[in-house]
Amino acid sequence: MKDEAGERDREVSSLNSKLLSLQLDIKNLHDVCKRQRKTLQDNQLCMEEAMNSSHDKKQAQALAFEESEVEFGSSKQCHLRQLQQLKKKLLVLQQELEFHTEELQTSYYSLRQYQSILEKQTSDLVLLHHHCKLKEDEVILYEEEMGNHNENTGEKLHLAQEQLALAGDKIASLERSLNLYRDKYQSSLSNIELLECQVKMLQGELGGIMGQEPENKGDHSKVRIYTSPCMIQEHQETQKRLSEVWQKVSQQDDLIQELRNKLACSNALVLEREKALIKLQADFASCTATHRYPPSSSEECEDIKKILKHLQEQKDSQCLHVEEYQNLVKDLRVELEAVSEQKRNIMKDMMKLELDLHGLREETSAHIERKDKDITILQCRLQELQLEFTETQKLTLKKDKFLQEKDEMLQELEKKLTQVQNSLLKKEKELEKQQCMATELEMTVKEAKQDKSKEAECKALQAEVQKLKNSLEEAKQQERLAAQQAAQCKEEAALAGCHLEDTQRKLQKGLLLDKQKADTIQELQRELQMLQKESSMAEKEQTSNRKRVEELSLELSEALRKLENSDKEKRQLQKTVAEQDMKMNDMLDRIKHQHREQGSIKCKLEEDLQEATKLLEDKREQLKKSKEHEKLMEGELEALRQEFKKKDKTLKENSRKLEEENENLRAELQCCSTQLESSLNKYNTSQQVIQDLNKEIALQKESLMSLQAQLDKALQKEKHYLQTTITKEAYDALSRKSAACQDDLTQALEKLNHVTSETKSLQQSLTQTQEKKAQLEEEIIAYEERMKKLNTELRKLRGFHQESELEVHAFDKKLEEMSCQVLQWQKQHQNDLKMLAAKEEQLREFQEEMAALKENLLEDDKEPCCLPQWSVPKDTCRLYRGNDQIMTNLEQWAKQQKVANEKLGNQLREQVKYIAKLSGEKDHLHSVMVHLQQENKKLKKEIEEKKMKAENTRLCTKALGPSRTESTQREKVCGTLGWKGLPQDMGQRMDLTKYIGMPHCPGSSYC
């Protein structure tokens, strides 16, 4: 915001400066208008005075005319002349008035335009001022909000630290109370390990986050360090370029001054030469006037010859001077071109500097935007962290309440445990008393058995014994219930301890997270302060850079003005040089006209002959070059054909290799599919084994139920035998059998536990195999997709190969056509050579004729000029016509040869382009083949990895096989055990009912 305000202040200052400059321009225009009005008023006064004077003069002249018409006739004519001059002056003044009025109107319109522009700019300035004030108010409000926000965050941090200290004290007290329970509850170790793994994961994530934050810090510092030296270097470079531009401008000014001096000297020389020419022309005219008639004597002829020689010498010297002037003009033109090139280079440098300035401005704006974005991101991060901190505080409060509730529950459970233990002790004492009573009663029963006379008392005692047994059974049932309740209470206590430890760990984690968040908040606040400082430093640098940029822009504008002035001066100089060139050319045309008339015929003939010989030599060289080029092209074509053949072979080999690799991949896929099928079969067999195990478990349950029924029957029989008073020997046998049954039951229960553990392990292995199966199916799908892609790419490659083969065939056809064309061109070339030989013979004949004609001309020159003058021009005309025909024929033939050679060159260029195209397509095909080979290698590696994984899974399944066989063997042993003696076993059935009623099997799912 501050940067925008500064930029707008600078724009306002620039607009104010522009306004002041416009006001000064308007004042200057007003002054000019006032001056022009004053001049117009002065002109009008002069006109009025002249009119008044002329009117007075007319009146005086009329009076004088009336008085003396004869004396002042001549004065009348003078007055009329003066009147005409005055009228002319009036017309001129009127034209000047009209011109000045037009200028005033244009200046008035321009003033109006400037006023409208000023009004627009003033309105824009007012809007900008208003916008700047609004932005300043927004910045002040934003700073106040940031200050309040920082104060609130500081207060919240202090409160959070106090709350954290209180929570730490509470946690210390809880840790002291929980250290007592750690020795009792070791079953929570597995949960602790899982939670430790989660803590490690979270610590890793926190470490990653903390690592990202210093990296971001380092990036900010790097950007800050990088931007300032880059800006300084760029400003230094711009200053250096400006100094170079000023040096070039000063050099151009010096060159322009030197050129002006040279032009002044050349103008002076030209004026002198013109004067000398005028004098010579006058002398020549006087000579021709004096010497019209033929000379009468030999002396006069000699004098005339001397004068002519002198004139020729003067003419030669003038020609030399003219050539020197031409050379000077050429040098001036070269210097002007160099100056123009320097100016263009300077303009290019200026444009580059302007582009660099624009780039610097864009970079500064982008850097400011980046910093603003970083500040906004950090502010959002601060807000998010504050919200997370408040949420963690709420969670800690909830956890504290939950811990208090858990403590209360634990205290209540401990009280209940103590009560249950007391009741159990009481019941144990009662059981001991009842056992003592039972032993006493048994003793009495034995005594009663010995005494047959006391049967009635025995019956009564037996009834009492049954009652006592019933009471014992009830007491044992109560004990079982109490034991179950105690076990439940212990389990609840263990769960409560686990929950307490979990809550403790969560609290510790929350405290660590709170500390980390507080540290991150402090670090972010420090970063904010650092960023604010950096932004202030960057703003200062930007202000200094903008000032420098403004200074540089002013210097650029001054340099551009100077360049425009130099352009104007250059144009003026070019105009003057062009005028002088025109004058010099006119002079040269006048001087060299006679020479051209005399030596044009000879020069033309000699030049034509030389050109014809040169053309013939050039054609021969071109023919030799074309032959060599044709040979080279044929060699290149043969090399290209060989390369195409080799590449076709390589493409075919690569396609074969790709097909072989695809076949290998398909075979590997089939192997994978067979492995999958085998794993599925194993999975089905394992499921069948599990079903068999479940059936066997159900059978064992049924056998247990039957055992329970047999035990009930045995109990009933025991009661019956007790009623009928069976002998002691039968009772002992039944007790032995019951002990054996009890041992068998314990073994069966152990086997059941073992079977259940094995079933669990089998279920786990089943889940693992299912997961592996899903992974293998996904991999198979991915392989199928890869195969599809490879097949599509192979098809594309085959299509490319077919296209390349078709192109090669087409290229071969074109080569054949080109070879045919080359043969035709060779034939044409031979025909052309024959034509050239014939034309060379004609040229020789023409040269011989020309030599003979020259000899005849020399002889005619030697002979006296007594022949009539009309015969010579006829011979020369015939010679000219013959030479013109020869030259036209030669030119036509040369043009035809040029056209044919151009066609050949174009065709050869097209062939070279087509060859380059084919080589590019060849490179593309080669890159595609390399890419496909790399993909095939990757697929092979992946298939090998999958094979290794499949072998590992096979080894695992093989390792699981013997365990399953052992479990089945154990089940068979359990099934073949002798369960037949159970209904005959009697004795200690009360202990068996304990195991049957509540088989305490840890880890069994069928309890």
UniProtKB/Swiss-Prot annotation:
The keyword Nucleus appears for this protein: no
Coiled-coil region list: 76-103, 157-203, 322-717, 759-793, 829-863, 922-956
Protein name in UniProt: Polyamine-modulated factor 1-binding protein 1
Organism listed in the record: Homo sapiens
Keyword Coiled coil among record annotations: yes
InterPro entries: PMF1-bd (IPR037391)
Disease: Spermatogenic failure 31: An autosomal recessive infertility disorder caused by spermatogenesis defects that result in oligozoospermia with a high proportion of acephalic sperm.
Localization, UniProt: Cell projection, Cilium, Flagellum
Keywords, alphabetical: Cell projection, Cilium, Coiled coil, Disease variant, Flagellum
Broad class of where this protein is predominantly found: other
Known role: Required for normal spermatogenesis. It functions as a scaffold protein that attaches the sperm head-tail connecting piece to the nuclear envelope, thus maintaining sperm head and tail integrity. May also be involved in the general organization of cellular cytoskeleton.
Any GO BP: gene expression
A GO cellular-component term linked to this record: sperm head
